[in-house]
Amino acid sequence: MAFDYKKEYKEFYLPSRKPHLITVPPMNFVTVQGKGDPNDPAGEYQAAMEVLYGLAYTIKMSYKGSHRMEGFFEYVVPPLEGLWHQQGVDGVDYAHKETFEWTSMIRLPEFVTREEFDWAVQEATAKKKQDFSTAEFRTYDEGLCVQCMHIGPYDTEPETLRQMDAFA
């Protein structure tokens, strides 16, 4: 059975709907940074999704080819995560999504080193005939955080964020 990060780390991927404290350890990610409305079908965000998932699946399926990664285990690709902000805005201005600046990312298994990531970029570029150079290998060490599950439309996120701010 493939290792599933959502099931094995429920405290990170299936949090309570109430704000709470959690310590998040360092984790490696494939990331792409960009700007603009994520709903624009011709925008940077759509291109970033192709890069992120292209690399995530190149790594996941690497065991079927000749390349061997030390410590490899079969796994379910973790969910997409993102960091969003807008310059000069207090909170989020959903009426102006074109001003979003974002980092979208997918967690990488612990066996993926920078060298393995670089191999995946070269492999995906060669196989898919696309540019994967916008992707970066990054380690995030979040430490102590306030976490809460938001359920509902994006436009109601500010209320969830207010609850988290009040808790903190």
Predicted regions mapped to residue ranges:
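A solvent-exposed interaction/effector surface
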Residues: 1-168
